[in-house]
A protein has these predicted regions:
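C-terminal binding/interaction regions
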Residues: 1-55, 60-77, 83-160
Length: 160
């Protein structure tokens, strides 16, 4: 079990001690999408959803989600984030809401989980705001696009 950083000698879960790691700038970018019907797409685009401006509310929810990441991911460290930016856009060809989150900090641990949680929360908010019109929306392709900083080096996803 000693090869696994999130388990102690007894095989029980533990939070990794990052106290000895050097502080470095960390940036993570994540993305995802919500596939919607033509009707739902039109209502989002025109601002006609009864619950309000879907993209603005989802953007705010994504920021809130990033800030709450250690509350819902058990072994995630609470960290002081320097910035959280969500970009939501409509893709007519895919008929989707495209979501991208960028999270940054100067710290001892990365912000990948915060970026992924921001995207997930924004996507769930899109679903919540549109579910009265459409129940079969699909939340999909939530993924880490890149991460920089830290001892494990940089990562950049190759998109097809």
């Amino acid at each position: 079990m000693s090869d696994f950083t999130h388990f102690n000698e007894q095989g029980r879960a533990k939070m990794v001690d990052v106290g000895e790691k050097p502080i470095s700038q960390r940036i993570a970018v994540a993305a995802g999408r919500v596939l919607v019907s033509e009707k739902t797409f039109g209502l989002i685009q025109s601002g006609g959803m009864k619950k309000g401006d879907v993209l603005t509310v989802a953007q705010i929810a994504g920021v809130m989600g990033a800030k709450r990441t250690p509350d819902i991911i058990p072994m995630c460290h609470p960290i002081l984030m320097d910035g959280i930016n969500l970009e939501l856009s409509l893709d007519e060809e895919r008929r989707s809401v495209e979501i991208k989150a960028t999270v940054s900090c100067d710290g001892r641990t990365g912000v990948e989980m915060e970026a992924l949680t921001a995207v997930s929360t924004a996507a769930l908010t899109v679903y919540d705001m549109c579910k009265a019109v459409q129940k079969d929306m699909v939340i999909t392709d939530i993924r880490l696009l890149s991460k920089t900083g830290g001892v494990h080096g940089d990562y950049f996803r190759e998109e097809n």
